[in-house]
Swiss-Prot record:
UniProt topology in membrane: Single-pass membrane protein
Transmembrane segments: 318-338
Function (record text): Catalyzes the conversion of methylthioalkyl glucosinolates of any chain length into methylsulfinylalkyl glucosinolates. Prefers probably short-chain methylthioalkyl glucosinolates in cv. Landsberg erecta.
Pfam families: FMO-like (PF00743)
Expression triggers: Down-regulated at late stage by auxin.
Name of the protein this chain belongs to: Flavin-containing monooxygenase FMO GS-OX3
Gene, per the UniProt record: FMOGS-OX3
InterPro entries documented for this protein: FAD/NAD-bd_sf, Flavin_mOase, Flavin_mOase-like, FMO-like
Gene Ontology biological process terms from the UniProt entry: glucosinolate biosynthetic process
Family: Belongs to the FMO family.
Amino acid sequence: MAPAQNQITSKHVAVIGAGPAGLITSRELRREGHSVVVFEREKQVGGLWVYTPKSDSDPLSLDPTRSKVHSSIYESLRTNVPRESMGVRDFPFLPRFDDESRDARRYPNHREVLAYIQDFAREFKIEEMIRFETEVVRVEPVDNGNWRVQSKNSGGFLEDEIYDAVVVCNGHYTEPNIAHIPGIKSWPGKQIHSHNYRVPDPFENEVVVVIGNFASGADISRDIAKVAKEVHIASRAREPHTYEKISVPQNNLWMHSEIDTTHEDGSIVFKNGKVIFADSIVYCTGYKYNFPFLETNGYLRIDEKRVEPLYKHVFPPALAPGLAFVGLPAMGIVFVMFEIQSKWVAAVLSGRVTLPSTDKMMEDINAWYASLDALGIPKRHTHTIGRIQSEYLNWVAKESGCELVERWRGQEVDGGYLRLVAHPETYRDEWDDDELIEEAYNDFSRKKLISVDPSYYLENGR
């Protein structure tokens, strides 16, 4: 940690977004003594986790004039991280066994996550800092290191304000990334990105190709298989010869290597040589980072899903500490990442912790990029740090002077990932890490975060 010699100061900070990252960041900023205004374009907290049956007017979300929907949640979604690890460290995501309106499962549905987020906002009185139905349309640096934030409310009124700092928490699951497929422009079938997928009904009796086989791809392919004639998964992570029948009750799901080409007769050719005639393609191919409101005078750019340059995925050196990002990395312990990153941002803004010089931060960034290159890791995976998530979070925690990440959190998430890969149909309901669950609830008890004996959760959780 780099403790500052300067006097502790309170800053006027704008936070963009009232999803989990924005809510947690706002709490930490206020705890550090800053005054905070949160801008949220929707009517409620929750961000991504606010489910809506609506979707973008363009199913591929390529048309810049399309009507947009922020959420990418599908109706059947359940978490892919266990609730013990998912919650904020001083506000655990506890099951409500006595409330039938809540989902008490270890891997709950999206409505339970939204309820937890709403509970968090109420508990810490975050909503009093939020301007709902207010969209940020422009953020730009001005004199003296300050920032101009232009916002537009539901009535269309534009307002310009000056802030000492801006923390961007707008999420990165809204702007779809579409994989390039040879011949796709002349292929006649339907195409949709998972951002716009909600329920399987539109695919009834169809032959469907799902591109991508990680969390959303595994979920959506099996969801569609309930109603489709056939579902074929195309995965670039598989060997070119891959062709496997996947066991599902409907007996209609296959795994392939990636697509080689498509044709105007409706055929799709996989690199394993198999040919099918499909009705629809669903792209489960991830998302792009997107900050359409942000003007940085060329100091920050996005290149192949790399937001650069960013010191430790948070601070752009030339603009720090007045501009910061919370929540960019892809990892399993997401809410805890929001918490630890925002503690660091809050401490730096108050002057309690100092950053290295601009040159030192750039040296660190370039060393990180060089290490990725040496390992052959593509630029698009710059912010994919799941394998080193505990190491990264503990480094940030030490910088901000807060508690390190509990051992059991990383172990739960890593074990869950292995189960997801090996048993995507059952990993949420069958597990073999009860000792980690016990360790988690004993930890909550020691910290006086639960008022009943840990055995209550252990016995009812099964």
